[in-house]
Design a protein with these regions (language model features):
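Claisen-condensing/thiolase-fold acyl-transfer catalytic domains that form or cleave C-C bonds
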Residues: 1-79
């Protein structure tokens, strides 16, 4: 899982609500550590996810972004 956690409090809530193992989320560091450039967060999150899926030989991944105004978007990708 690659979650844009620029607002890290919401990420904690998502992990809890979806019962995700924190060890499987943002394994190379998230947006707070790596950055979340305006207009490029989605690209950064998706490319990081795709590279990690190849590295771990995973077939399915999930990328999500928080957006301004309390909105969000998510994408499931398969390879």
């Amino acid at each position: 899982y690659e979650i844009n956690e620029a607002f890290s409090g919401s990420t904690v809530a998502v992990l809890k609500e979806l019962e995700l193992n924190p060890a499987t989320v943002n394994v190379n560091g998230g947006s707070v550590a790596l950055g979340h450039p305006i207009g490029a967060s989605g690209c950064r999150v998706l490319v990081t996810l795709l590279h990690e899926m190849i590295k771990q030989d995973k077939k399915t991944g999930l990328a999500s972004l928080c957006l301004g105004g309390g909105e969000a978007v998510a994408m499931v990708v398969q390879r």
